[in-house]
Curated annotation (Swiss-Prot):
This is Saposin-B-Val. InterPro entries: SapB_2 (IPR008138), Saposin (IPR008373), Saposin-like (IPR011001), SaposinB_dom (IPR008139). Glycans are attached at N21. Disulfide bonds join C4-C77, C7-C71, C36-C47. Saposin-B stimulates the hydrolysis of galacto-cerebroside sulfate by arylsulfatase A (EC 3.1.6.8), GM1 gangliosides by beta-galactosidase (EC 3.2.1.23) and globotriaosylceramide by alpha-galactosidase A (EC 3.2.1.22). Saposin-B forms a solubilizing complex with the substrates of the sphingolipid hydrolases.
Length: 80
């Protein structure tokens, strides 16, 4: 498969989910915080704080960017 296209599709789906489902973001943030627990005691708290602080900004930024640009930023698509 084409990693770039897959990324664009995933970001598009995420943006649609955020737009149409108010609890989606909350679930995503909670899931991310649960993943933090894998890092061990000291790092887990730091990870959770980071998510609490930046998740809203990150989601707002994601909502205002084109999926292709986001995928380019994270390295799944060639920058144009």
């Amino acid at each position: 498969g084409d990693v770039c296209q897959d990324c664009i599709q995933m970001v598009t789906d995420l943006q649609n989910a955020v737009r149409t489902n108010s609890t989606f973001v909350e679930a995503l943030v909670n899931h991310a915080k649960e993943e933090c627990d894998r890092l061990g005691p000291g790092m887990a708290d730091m990870c959770k704080n980071y998510i609490s602080q930046y998740s809203e900004i990150a989601i707002q930024m994601m909502m205002h960017m084109q999926p292709k640009d986001i995928c380019g930023l994270v390295g799944f698509c060639e920058e144009v």
